[in-house]
């Protein structure tokens, strides 16, 4: 579009600005990044106004990372507070329409980059702000007036961040007393399909969106004001399994929106047909087979989990709209759900959390488990995690003994099977050679133990070993 120094089109959704082509980075894992939309009286809004508090684009150094906050104020006859998070989630859409400007994540995890090519065409964030507001008012006509303030001053960004977190907390609390069984419809969201084409985000009262920005009420408000938009109704259909959270309606939409890639999504399962994971998720869960437990790591944690992998690596192999057994992306508020991974043990299966995340969701953790869940201060690897869980008598420890007994039983069964093998009748014309007995005090015999193995043998030759002279 001629009035802006960069092209604007949905074709730029999914465009990545790589580090080598980046002019500046805004927010992200190395700094603070925030976006917030607030409903306001029409008289309090100066339409299309862009305010910049802190260094503007022309004042920034190439290759540097800066703190970043975007506060949008919207007004209109139909605008109400219930629409704030709905409009807020479309920020991701419309910023990515702008060529050379990459936007990832949401709320207090925003990560943006401006390319060198785009920065060469504009020296201020003002045209960028005006372009985004133009897109909002074009696509969402219930917004009659809009203004935006960009913050790049660290102190100001921190101040806005604290205020915003309280607002987000109040929004999320609205679904506390509403549950999956209380409603007839869930809501779907396809905003992340530009980056994760097969992702099917299902929002229910007991399961917030993976990005953490859309709860059930937000989905309802969005579908009402923008029926053709990215949020829409999903008829629940028949309940197939109350524990896993499997519904016929969800399975149908999963198959349709993933182009047949998946035919089942179980809302509250970690292992069996789990919810797909996009890339905007706030937290990723990972199975730790050595302790039969599940750990969780969020974007803010910069260290390694006990499995020796960091968030970014796990996110890379979990995201993309896939169902990866052993990994699961979620929104932070799902920790507060009474149905939190209930098909696989719920909180009794959680063994590790980063200390800051554990502190953040303290109210969600059952009182009897708070001191039994390790953090990086208690366990940095599998061995130290196992020792911690044993010392605290975590619920997963009880499963270890059962697993060992099962292994012993399997070994005994295998020994019996091997011992019985020579008694089988050989095929006609075949002479089974005599097996040499071991000398000395040994009782002789053969023990073969196969665990989790599938073996196909075309031919087996048993011959006497001749001593070398």
UniProtKB/Swiss-Prot annotation:
Classification via SUPFAM superfamilies: Prismane protein-like
Please give the cofactor(s) recorded in the UniProt entry for this protein: [Ni-Fe-S] cluster
The UniProt record lists the EC number as 2.3.1.169
Q: Which UniProt keywords apply?
A: Acyltransferase, Iron, Iron-sulfur, Metal-binding, Methanogenesis, Nickel, Transferase
Q: In which pathway does it act?
A: One-carbon metabolism; methanogenesis from acetate
Q: Which reaction does it catalyse?
A: Co(I)-[corrinoid Fe-S protein] + acetyl-CoA + H(+) = methyl-Co(III)-[corrinoid Fe-S protein] + CO + CoA
Q: Which GO terms describe its molecular function?
A: acetyltransferase activity; anaerobic carbon-monoxide dehydrogenase activity; CO-methylating acetyl-CoA synthase activity; iron ion binding; iron-sulfur cluster binding; nickel cation binding
What is one Gene Ontology biological process annotated in the Swiss-Prot or TrEMBL record? acetyl-CoA metabolic process
InterPro entries assigned: ACS_CODH_B_C (IPR045822), CO_DH/Ac-CoA_synth_bsu (IPR004461), CO_DH/Ac-CoA_synth_bsu_3_sf (IPR038571), CO_DH/Ac-CoA_synth_bsu_arc (IPR023432), Prismane-like_sf (IPR011254)
Q: Provide the top EC class.
A: transferase
Q: Which domain of life is it from?
A: Archaea
The reply to whether rRNA processing figures as a keyword in the UniProt entry is: no
Explain the purpose of this protein.
Answer: Part of a complex that catalyzes the reversible cleavage of acetyl-CoA, allowing growth on acetate as sole source of carbon and energy. The alpha-epsilon complex generates CO from CO(2), while the beta subunit (this protein) combines the CO with CoA and a methyl group to form acetyl-CoA. The methyl group, which is incorporated into acetyl-CoA, is transferred to the beta subunit by a corrinoid iron-sulfur protein (the gamma-delta complex).
How it assembles, according to the record, is: Monomer. The ACDS complex is made up of alpha, epsilon, beta, gamma and delta chains with a probable stoichiometry of (alpha(2)epsilon(2))(4)-beta(8)-(gamma(1)delta(1))(8) (Potential).
Q: Which PANTHER family match?
A: ACETYL-COA DECARBONYLASE_SYNTHASE COMPLEX SUBUNIT BETA 1, PTHR42281
Supply the name of the protein. Acetyl-CoA decarbonylase/synthase complex subunit beta 1
What does UniProt list as this organism's lineage? Archaea, Methanobacteriati, Methanobacteriota, Stenosarchaea group, Methanomicrobia
Point out the gene that encodes the protein. cdhC1
């Amino acid at each position: 579009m001629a009035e802006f120094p960069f092209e604007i089109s949905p074709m730029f959704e999914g465009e990545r600005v790589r580090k080598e082509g980046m002019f500046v980075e805004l927010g992200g894992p190395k700094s603070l990044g925030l976006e917030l939309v607030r409903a306001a009286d029409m008289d309090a809004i100066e339409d299309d106004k862009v305010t910049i508090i802190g260094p503007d684009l022309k004042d920034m150094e190439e290759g540097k990372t800066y703190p970043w906050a975007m506060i949008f104020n919207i007004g209109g006859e139909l605008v109400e507070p219930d629409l704030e998070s709905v409009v807020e989630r479309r920020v991701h859409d419309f910023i990515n329409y702008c060529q050379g400007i990459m936007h990832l994540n949401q709320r207090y995890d925003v990560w943006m980059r401006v390319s060198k090519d785009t920065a060469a065409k504009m020296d201020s964030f003002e045209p960028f702000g005006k372009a985004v507001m133009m897109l909002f008012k074009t696509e969402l006509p219930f917004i009659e007036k809009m203004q935006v303030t960009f913050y790049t001053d660290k102190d100001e960004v921190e101040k806005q961040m604290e205020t915003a977190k309280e607002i987000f907390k109040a929004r999320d609390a609205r679904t506390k007393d509403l549950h999956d069984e209380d409603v007839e419809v869930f809501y779907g969201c396809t905003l992340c399909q530009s980056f994760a084409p097969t992702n099917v985000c299902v929002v229910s009262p007991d399961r917030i969106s993976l990005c953490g920005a859309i709860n059930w009420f937000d989905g309802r408000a969005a579908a009402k004001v923008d029926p053709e938009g990215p949020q829409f109704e999903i008829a629940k259909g028949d309940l197939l399994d109350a524990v896993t959270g499997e519904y016929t309606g969800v399975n149908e939409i999963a198959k349709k929106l993933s182009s047949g890639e998946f035919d089942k999504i179980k809302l509250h399962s970690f292992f069996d047909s789990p919810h797909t994971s996009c890339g905007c998720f706030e937290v990723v869960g990972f199975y730790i087979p050595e302790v039969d437990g599940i750990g969780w790591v969020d974007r803010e944690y910069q260290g390694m989990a006990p499995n020796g992998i960091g968030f970014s690596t796990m996110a890379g192999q979990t995201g993309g709209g896939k169902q990866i057994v052993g990994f699961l992306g979620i929104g932070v508020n799902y920790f507060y759900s009474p149905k939190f991974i209930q098909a696989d043990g719920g909180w009794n299966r959680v063994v590790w959390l980063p200390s800051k995340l554990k502190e953040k969701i303290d109210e969600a953790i059952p009182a009897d488990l708070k001191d039994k869940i390790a953090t990086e201060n208690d366990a940095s690897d599998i061995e130290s995690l196992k020792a911690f869980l044993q010392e605290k008598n975590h619920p997963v420890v009880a499963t270890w003994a059962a697993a060992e007994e099962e292994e012993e039983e399997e070994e005994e069964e295998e020994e019996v099977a091997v011992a019985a093998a020579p008694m089988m009748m050989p095929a006609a014309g075949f002479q089974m050679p005599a097996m040499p007995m071991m000398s000395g005090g040994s009782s002789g015999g053969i023990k073969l133990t196969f665990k989790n193995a599938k073996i196909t043998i075309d031919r087996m030759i048993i011959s006497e070993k001749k001593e070398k002279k």
